[in-house]
Amino acid sequence: MKFIGIIPARYASTRFPGKPLAILGGKPMIQRVYERASLALEEVWVATDDTRIADAVKAFGGNVVMTSAAHRSGTDRCLEAYRNIGSDADVVINIQGDEPFIDPLQLKQIQSCFDDPDTRIATLVRPYNPEGGIEGLENPNSPKVALDAEGYALLFSRSVIPYLRGVERREWPSRHQYYTHIGMYAYRAGTLAEITALPQLSLIHI
């Protein structure tokens, strides 16, 4: 099975414009992400709509493909990149462009999900450490995931899920195993095309 890693990278972030080019230890952030991803994947590309990012990737010898500036999400950008590259990879891994310390082992783990021929989409979670307390659990920058008994994701939320009725809120982390999301998704190529064609629900913008 063939995998391709695609790193969607935008310059015009509302919270941190130019984030992919922020210098970390003498290298642009996008280079840090690219190099870490390359430790686990034979083929990695940066997908961007900005020539400044494209030039930075070319400068360190990375693969880069230009995409439209009109995409609704990084997922849509990944699909266009996959098509523009002319890739024949079976699985596309969407790698966040602001994760300079991404663990190559996690990339290997998400690839292993596709050992099951029925897997169409995969993502990763980590058990929440109760020592972080309720304050850490409530951090909206750390999305939570509710899982079923077989480990399938039921719901993603920036709020704490599930709600523990009848339990003091500060006790929640020690009374239930919560999970937080690791921002990485992998899709079989056909499934990626299918989901990007679906209309977005209003909930995604909340």
Language model: regions and residue ranges:
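N-terminal glycine-rich phosphate-binding loop and ensuing alpha1 helix
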Residues: 2-48
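Short phosphate-binding loop-to-helix
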Residues: 45, 52-109
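Conserved small/polar residues in nucleotide/adenosyl-binding loops
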Residues: 204-206
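Short beta-strand segments
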Residues: 8, 94-96, 124-125
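Conserved core of the sugar-phosphate nucleotidyltransferase
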Residues: 104-198
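Short, high-confidence coil segments that cap the C-terminus of an alpha-helix
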Residues: 41, 87-89, 117-121
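Short aromatic/basic micro-patch
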Residues: 15, 101, 186
